[in-house]
Regions:
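A juxtamembrane structural motif centered on a specific transmembrane helix
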Residues: 141-198
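Alpha-helical transmembrane segments of multi-pass membrane proteins
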Residues: 23-27, 134-144
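Signal for well-folded cores of large energy- and translation-related assemblies
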Residues: 42, 58, 62, 90, ...
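Hydrophobic, glycine- and aromatic-enriched re-entrant/interface helices and adjoining loop segments
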Residues: 10-100, 125-127
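Alpha-helical transmembrane segments of polytopic integral membrane proteins
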Residues: 30, 34, 106-113, 136, ...
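Hydrophobic transmembrane alpha-helices and their immediate junctions
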Residues: 96-140
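Alpha-helical transmembrane bundle and helix-membrane interface signal
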Residues: 1-32, 114-123, 180-194
Length: 198
């Protein structure tokens, strides 16, 4: 958000460096955190959740086992309805199903960033920053969740927006998309027409 708002690169560099330093200190001072990171980096098979997710995705192949045909979700894969929903999709719908999900997210994010760009062109800086923040949050959460499921990142408990089970996750995702649609509506209509909606 600081980068989009036009902050100086030195200020942004200081904030990012301080954040990375604090995270690094937190990891080094707690043996549990350090073990989780080092065990993941040395051998992903030691992380049960990641290993079971990869087994499920490999079992799915190109076309999957069919809806309801996956077996990893039955006590083998921890939290299949929340953190590891992408692995369940990979097992039951295959690589093609995972690609469909990725393309759907790419379409939503592309539209969202376009809404932010249009709002900025119309002179609505605050609305543009809000839209950009929502899209960036979605993109980061999607990236981390899919990275966890594919074994590229250690498990962290991030849900997959609009797909993972969980009341607060779904509610916040829907509210965020509603705000995004409101920004789009305000950017496309004049002030007089906006007053008619109220």
């Amino acid at each position: 958000m600081l980068f989009v708002a036009g902050s100086y690169k030195t200020q942004l560099g200081i904030v990012v460096s301080a954040f990375i330093g604090v995270v690094f200190i937190f990891i080094l001072t707690d043996p549990t955190r350090l073990y989780r990171l080092t065990s993941y980096l040395s051998d992903p098979s030691q992380v049960h959740q990641t290993w079971q997710a990869l087994i499920g995705i490999a079992r799915g192949g190109w076309f999957g086992t069919g809806l309801g045909g996956g077996i990893q979700k039955y006590s083998l894969l921890p939290e299949p309805q929340t953190d590891m929903i992408f692995a369940v999709i990979g097992e039951e719908l295959g690589i093609l199903g995972m690609l469909f999900v990725l393309l759907s997210y790419t379409y939503i994010l592309g539209k969202g960033f376009n809404i932010a760009k249009i709002a900025l062109k119309k002179g609505r800086k605050y609305s543009s920053f809000v839209a950009f923040g929502i899209c960036t949050w979605f993109a980061m959460q999607i990236t981390v969740n899919i990275g966890m499921n594919l074994g590229l990142l250690p498990p962290k408990g991030f849900t997959l927006p609009l797909l993972s089970y969980g009341g607060s996750s779904i509610i916040f995702s829907i509210i965020s998309l509603a705000i995004l649609m409101r920004v789009d509506m305000e950017s496309r209509t004049s002030y007089v027409k906006q007053r008619e909606y109220v």
